[in-house]
Amino acid sequence: MSKFKSLLLLFGTLILLSGCSNIEVFNAKGPVASSQKFLIIYSIIFMLVIVAVVLSMFAIFIFKYSYKKNSESGKMHHNSLIETIWFVVPILIVIALAIPTVKTLYDYEKPPEKDKDPLVVYAVSAGYKWFFAYPDQHIETVNTLTIPKDRPVVFKLQSMDTMTSFWIPQLGGQKYAMTGMTMNWTLTADQLGTFRGRNSNFNGEGFSRQTFKVHSVSQNDFDKWVKEAKGKKTLSQDTFDKQLLPSTSNKELTFSGTHMAFVDPAADPEYIFYAYKRYNFEQKDPNFTAEEDLYKDVKDKPIKPARKVHITNPNYERHGMKPMILGNNEKYDNEFKKEEDHNSKEMEKISKGAKDENASKLHKKEHDDHGGGH
């Protein structure tokens, strides 16, 4: 068998094997995912029809108008009909793709129906983990999410460090979580089961392991789970701060109480840096630091007091939730500013030293070029 045939056979086998995989996007378990599945299939079929028509016309023109002996070359003339077709048809294609896409996208942003009481969950990304706070149930989980079937879930997406993207392929598309703000995303599971969720936006060496499990259960089972979760260890500020340290272990944890008792990440984006200092954690480049040295200075217990905050909105309004207003910790802010000023001065010294060194080298070179002054 020739090398070309072998490669062709291998390529064909790979294409056939790809059909054996379970593509989560096409295995929809919620209304949003079902709408997106329809859009994807609609767009693929629509574009395949266009490709088929174009290739067919291409083949016809090649054979019908190919060069023949003694044939005369045609002359180009103005043709209003053809010009109208090649301007109007692309516009109609864009409209046919845009209308269902825009309509579906706007439907995603609609709030839950009034007769359906939504479950509110704060999904917070930090340290290659996902924290899920249930403010009404007063529980919190890490890297695992439990939701009731057929009940809308209003996710309040936040990030405490890098920009990430919250994505549960079988329930709906991704949406970004960013520092200093809260993004809303409503999803519903219409089937029971366990689904996979992940961060779909690259954010560092732990990106591939920033995943979580989603358990869709009946309302009765959800109520039982909430009751059991309330009996777990209470989430203290010390415990939460330590959980903020970057880790790719992907452990699943459950606590009673939530971090929202002492911080709203959207209103206090610098909180995580103070948490690092409490446990003497210093961010290092993993490409130039041995794994055992990344956390060798981290303390088991905090070496600084917890950051004091004052919550003025503890009830978390359920629709259009306003962020909590946090009072600044003057002592911490002053320390942080002093450190920033110190680092800025150090950088200026280094920059000045580098400029002086370059000037000295240039002066020496000019001196040598002129024969050392002789």
From Swiss-Prot:
Enzyme superclass (EC): oxidoreductase
Region of interest (Disordered), residue spans: 317-374
Lipidated sites in chain (N-palmitoyl cysteine): 20
UniProt KW keywords: Cell membrane, Electron transport, Lipoprotein, Membrane, Oxidoreductase, Palmitate, Respiratory chain, Signal, Transmembrane, Transmembrane helix, Transport
Residues bearing a lipid moiety (S-diacylglycerol cysteine): 20
Catalysed transformations (reactions): 2 a quinol + O2 = 2 a quinone + 2 H2O
Pfam families: COX2_TM (PF02790)
Cellular component terms per the entry's GO annotation: plasma membrane
Cross-referenced InterPro entries: CcO_II (IPR045187), CcO_II-like_C (IPR002429), Cupredoxin (IPR008972), CuRO_UO_II (IPR034227), Cyt_c_oxidase_su2_TM_dom (IPR011759), Cyt_c_oxidase_su2_TM_sf (IPR036257), QoxA (IPR006332)
Biased composition regions of type Basic and acidic residues, renumbered to the chain: 330-374
Similarity comment text for this entry: Belongs to the cytochrome c oxidase subunit 2 family.
UniProt-recorded name of the protein: Probable quinol oxidase subunit 2
Record organism: Staphylococcus epidermidis (strain ATCC 35984 / DSM 28319 / BCRC 17069 / CCUG 31568 / BM 3577 / RP62A)
Classification of source organism: Bacteria, Bacillati, Bacillota, Bacilli, Bacillales
Gene of this entry: qoxA
